[in-house]
């Protein structure tokens, strides 16, 4: 087991600097934050208006295909993980429509102790065709894979994403805990 290094601050870069020289940052193999990178997206404008406007905007692109969603009881506190016996999970995976998921999220928003509900990495081209075109990433990338996470409060266990990621938080809040690549052997039991 490799010991963890001391946490360090993430480079915060200006969105204009990223737009001017994207290769410098996307090929740096170092995490960074560009907070205002997608502020001009219509999706962000809808989210700034209200959660309901955000969901309505997404539904305007929805293909109608079933999506996978994950549902955990309120007592998991949003932490999707193994069950206490470690022989299964503390959540259910369900197939549903984005319309139904959106309605559930609207309802749960007023619940003081809601169950946790989220739709994991969902490919935009298949489930929300046209959304990427209407909200283009303002830097040139070769064939980016664009996907959406959507849900209420959730805590996802550390995991390894093979592709490099540019995560754009367009509604609500999102926090990432990043580990150095040499820690991948410590992520899984």
Regions of interest found by a model, annotated:
Residues 1-189:
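N-terminal accessory scaffold of Fe(II)-dependent oxygenases
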């Amino acid at each position: 087991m490799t010991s963890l290094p001391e946490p360090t601050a993430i480079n915060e870069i200006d969105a204009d600097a990223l737009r001017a020289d994207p290769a410098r940052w996307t090929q740096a193999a170092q995490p960074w934050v560009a907070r205002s990178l997608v502020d001009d997206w219509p999706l962000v404008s809808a989210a700034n208006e209200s959660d309901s406007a955000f969901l309505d905007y997404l539904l305007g692109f929805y293909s109608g295909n079933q999506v996978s969603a994950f549902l955990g009881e309120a007592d998991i506190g949003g932490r999707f993980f193994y069950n206490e016996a470690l022989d299964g999970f503390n959540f259910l995976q369900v197939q549903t429509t984005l319309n139904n998921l959106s309605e559930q999220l609207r309802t749960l928003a007023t619940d003081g102790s809601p169950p946790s509900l989220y739709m994991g990495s969902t490919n935009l081209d298949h489930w929300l065709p046209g959304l990427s075109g209407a909200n283009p990433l303002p830097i040139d990338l070769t064939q980016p894979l664009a996907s959406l996470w959507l849900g209420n409060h959730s805590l996802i266990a550390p995991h390894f994403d093979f592709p490099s990621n540019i995560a754009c938080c367009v509604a609500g809040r999102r926090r990432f805990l990043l580990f150095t690549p040499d820690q991948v052997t410590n992520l899984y039991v």
